[in-house]
């Protein structure tokens, strides 16, 4: 019998090499050409992926699974079951923001098929356990993943709920995918006579921490990978069964190049974490692979597979998942508003997207990996993962309370168990990891809304434990939450996104109050009702916008169009109306109904341009209403309070112009169902303006009972008003020209509601406390001091404000900024004197204390009194992820006349350019007795800082962009 060898000419010519047991060598008396794969025909195969039934299936569902795969939708088109753990889908993109879902419609290369994908997120992860079939005729490419990748065309690609198919044109392979909850099934139909060389990649996309692979004869394998990306430790286990035995397998090696100190190039072979399996041709030449997935272990993956896909029958398994999807669409039939056409397809596709997340996380035996990285068993419920709660608390979860009450109950139990495992309710949980992406504690409104709709925990103990979890989560351990409790707002000079955090914390506190009220805890209900009023502490009565509080006052300068780090993925326009639990009071502060309507009109009719930093999420603009991101989603429905006709006008406009069943049919990230949930709920002629509050739904036209009998209204409402809600005096506003001053400075104080009394205390340096007084008019300070103010209650129905403090520094008038560097308008750090004001930046550039330059910085400082210089220093900041690097070079010059300058210091600093994470560095020149230059009687000091690069290099994701330089204090002694 002739021994079989495999010859892969492209691999041998490229940097990719397969290890010896399969391609060991070719005997010299045999012709290598005999072992080359047959060339791929350019003609369509008779077994094209467009097989009968696929188009019919797609028309039956009226779903376009490719919606959102282009533009910035970040969706995936592959096969998944409703809420399935498995999302078996092609991977066409390895990195980049528009590659977060692993696939982008503008691509024409498939790297392989992986079993997990995120639906519409703004951060990349998943893409686990990649399989890629080839016929062995691979390409000559430097990297092995490029060598095995295949081109594809969209006219040879199809998809529908639970199914995906594509022609891999480089190999003539027709690939089909289907899935169950925990299992994915691949089918690869080869050209007649072709072998299948299948690749398995553990390294795909994420940083690989650990992996393993086990063999069970020649028809089954299992293994795992532990990876790091958005989730810092993600465990993915699998068990795969092949429909035929493989005749060879091996681990891959890849050539790597390095250059030594002498400039000599060295080429070495290194083992990589990828494997290949050879399958010989058969009569039908179809290879199927069933792959069970688990977050627990390989045994769990095996159980999942055999519980859900015991039959090696692709069409049977496909039919089963299609039946599951049919039940979904029967739960919420399209409203009469959309009987046919694009509206119907939009509605069905939106509903489909909503049912792809969250994902089942427990195995069929109930086991799951918890947030403590331990294995637990879900008793009496199903465990879930992927909770994008900052997005989904708005419309998605209120909608699912109606469509999936039992599943909502499971999600509530999941939240509670997560709290047990790590001490906090989830913020943005992913595969048992807390990513801390986004802000707020928005699992709270999900639970509060569920209770409003009659969905309960199964026992009183869990009900009370959830309240304990809410309280614990709202109070820490993060410092920003502690500051919020102390001041009634998150200070913008200490924490980033302070306005958004204050507003969302206040809303979440309202939901805690409502939940406590519903389960009968009056004390907690009243405490959090008071905290929920903190949104007023960032409302500026002059501009009528929500603004950052800095040093007791409002941050200046203020531009409502500017995108900066005081807001979460937004500007002041897009957070102006976020007080969903207090719309009548917000309306009153804006002047009443007429004025409120006028301000809404301004929102929708403002210029669409924004200023400040680039924010890819701000899309789908109608004026400054940004439908492409969640903070705006409730705003069109605010017209329900003043002019319902405009609700209809803007809702209909958004539905018709910002949604379409096309690859670029979403105006922003899908965001785990929220973008689609907005459409579904809007199609029902309703919207939850304030989830968690019985009065928080607006509805019109046809009753929701057309969709679900539970939707005729809430159950009998809980008795409201079990406590007398007191009003808190808003935090007083301390206003001054500058934080650092020369000579003297006037201080004025005001309060939003005109508090009857404002108590003032002043603490000078050295802990000297001056006599307190009640504020009556602006007053003067002449020394460095801290001012503390408190608004006092004017009646029994009011509560004193917290103590608010502001620190002011009297600096020497000897330093004057003569020529100011060209700092960016969004990173002013307070203005022209920021580099000499005595206020030092901390290890977070987003607090606004660092001054930012998008290029070279050059400034000149005048010393009023000529000085013998002993030291000059300049502080710099680096965090390479947001494109901020230390200056590559800093120079100091001195002059006696401001015309002739002598260089006294130059430092090149490039050694840290690839180090991630925030860090600071001080460029320091010390002039002692040994210094030979002249630094006496210096009148002017010039500082020059050069950016790290002209353009960001290829090794960074921001390749081609301009690096930032962030600087703070210049100290001259």
Predicted regions and their residues:
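Beta-strand-rich extracellular modules
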Residues: 292-294, 790-794, 946-948
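Bacterial N-terminal signal peptides that target proteins for export
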Residues: 1-11
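Aromatic, loop-rich ligand-recognition surfaces of beta-strand-rich domains
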Residues: 841-905, 909-911, 919-973
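Accessory carbohydrate-recognition regions in carbohydrate-active enzymes
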Residues: 35-397, 401-445, 451-503, 516-537, ...
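Short proline/glycine-enriched turn/loop motifs at strand-loop junctions of beta-rich domains
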Residues: 192-194, 751-757, 866-869, 887
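Short, compositionally stereotyped local motifs that mark structural "simplifiers"
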Residues: 710-857
